[in-house]
Amino acid sequence: MEESAMKKFRLLALVLALLMVVPFVASCTDKKDDNTTTAADSKGTETGDTTSAGDKVKGDIDPADAVDHKDFTSVYDMIGSKVTIDMVTEDEEGLAWVTVDGVKYELGMDFLSMAMVYRTDVPANSEKYKTADDVYNEWWKLYIQRWNYLVPEIPLYSNQYFDLYNAKIDGFVTTPYWGPADAIVAAKVTTADNSVILGSATDLSGSFRNSSWGKSNPGSSDLDIQNLTSGYATIMTNKDGSYSWNEGVVDGTPASKVNEDGTLTFTIKIKKDLKFSDNSAINAKNYIAALLSNSTPVGAAAGGSGTAGQTVVGFAEFSAYDGTNDGKEVGDKNKVTATKFFKGVQLLDDYTFAVTYTSDYAGYYYSIVNAGFSPDPLPLYLGSEGAIVVDEATKACGLNDAFYAKVTENGAETYKVAGEIVANMKWNSALPYSGPYVVSNYDDNTHTATLKLNPVYPGDSFRGKASIATITYVKLVDETQMDMFKQGQVDVIAGITGGDATKAALKIVNDNPDKYKETHYDRAGYGKLGFRCDFGSTSFASVRRAIMLTINRNEFAQTFTGGYGSVVHGPYYEGSAAYKAVKDTIKLNVYTYSVQSAIDELVDGGWIYNEKGEKFDAAKDTVRYKKLSGYELSSDNLKFKSTDGKYSVIKLDGEYYMPLVVNWYGTQPNDVTNQLVTAWQTAKAAKDIGMYITYTSTEFNPGIYGELYRMEENGYDGTPKLNAINFATGFTSAVYDYAFNWTLNQNLYNDYNTAHLMDEADFYEKYTK
């Protein structure tokens, strides 16, 4: 599957939504100190060292003292194929274990997320598990319980979403899975102007052709524009989030076949009358160009992941090919024979292609999404001279020599096509679009995009045929968006949340029912405090749990939503089938506000020292410290310091101590940020537990993409700083799949591991030493 489709159909989730939390049964209790060995914490009791300050000598930080992981082999890679759900046991804390070949393994986030969608085979003669759904639901429960234990982010509120719109728009309906970009295509305007202005508080960045390119997650506004300008996907979602074949695109139902070697082949034939916005014809090559390109070093050099086809047969061999080494053995640790042709990607004729998935992924629970492909203009991913070539004997596809051609730029050799891909990704490149609309203009200063109706696009089975002539997409600010709406400067404000904003929106509708309308739904997701879980204090689960315990989340949610929301305790939507199936047995820590419980977590995690390496004394010491050991001594951790320069990792008598500092970036303007300043950063509870929190105001793109995801093009300067940032996450699809989102694989880590959490339980070396 191409990267944009994979992100859309699998990762999809950085803007999650609300659910009204039903009361939990007795299993939803506050957990006491956790004694598992999973978290990256060195356990301790609050005794500290009794030596005087004069006995400890302060030294310089030595990068040579860093201890970084070298072996990223995962438990799932080694034993995943041997494990069935009936082999798994659950301890009283809700953590999962399995014994294989005499070795007992704790199942980490990577294992559980992969097993949840790839190990749903029903055990033979099982009384408990009768269907793949039963197996999936159990894996899902164990995954949620571990997430709840490790706390990679803190759900702050789960609310109702209100979408406010001008009454001139008819048929505008939204759901947790059917956002404004889909709803506006299906809607009509009843006035002569036939135009609509959409608004969003999330900045546009201009990444409209593939909003996921080079990112772990797409910006929600960029994704809206991509959805409005993209069409002819082989599968689509409907209003309830479920997937179906796009009958206007596929010529007959695509065939799926499990082969003798356990691999799975999808064969897809598309119709012959599909056209881009410039009237150029679409054929099968347009559907596989991105998959091929972004499985090569050229795609990676252009900012892609280079791993789009990682689950397809022959990926390792094809991705190793660089245009010069066909048939040669390459690689140091894992040697493969490079090949020009991608064995698992076949072009059968001009309108038919086939993709074969490896046996490891053939049993995918949501198998239909593996057949999800969208067409792209060939130059977008192949450049002006690149082309798809076919092995006549096998029908396997590859890319021509021109695609791999190199040039010298600034004294360095690089792929020529990589630069073309970067240029072609821009909204105003000469390439056509495939969907209901085309981008006619984008103003980077005001973050405003103008879209015009694509008369060539015939519509689809789900959204129908678009009829609104012009859509303008503008930047909104909370403080002024209601005034803009009443003045006609915006026609749709989507995702209104928060008590004051919701009440203001409803008042506008109630005062002018003939002029304004609203639609609302329970949000499938939540606003959150997200963490960078591989750097500084927030790389420790004990710290993340302590933060969870010192934010009164129930009070926060009620204050922010004005009673139009509540709190959830993990990444789930109470309206989902999986949650409903396990809600009576799931074990969740609700993290009731408690300073003492937070202190207990920190003490248990080894945060028991002061800046002198002595026992922390709350009566006279301000900030706790932790003595680092093992992989806690990572290269980045040795550089950790507060953004204001007051605190940093110190070296005393050859031992390293980390301060309990959290560098928080708050997006502005944002009511959640303002509330967090009061409820968390400057609250007495933070001081009481010995935590120091810095606050840096940021805009969305430099905060999320620059500091959290460390993308230089968004302002990252090469020095890690951020520990926490508030934004939102959402389940915008009925497909709940977080496979690869917790990967240890360093080739995938930056593109897929959105929380940057490497669960120590997932490292295979942990069980072999």
Segments (PLM) and residue ranges:
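Detector for C-terminal structural segments
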Residues: 53, 58-207, 550-585, 597, ...
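N-terminal lobe/hinge region of extracytoplasmic solute-binding protein
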Residues: 155-157, 163-164, 176-182, 199-259, ...
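Gly/Pro-rich hinge or "lid" segments in bacterial periplasmic/extracellular proteins
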Residues: 213-231, 237-242, 340, 361, ...
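Extracellular/periplasmic solute-recognition and catalytic clefts
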Residues: 300-312, 440-456, 472-535, 546, ...
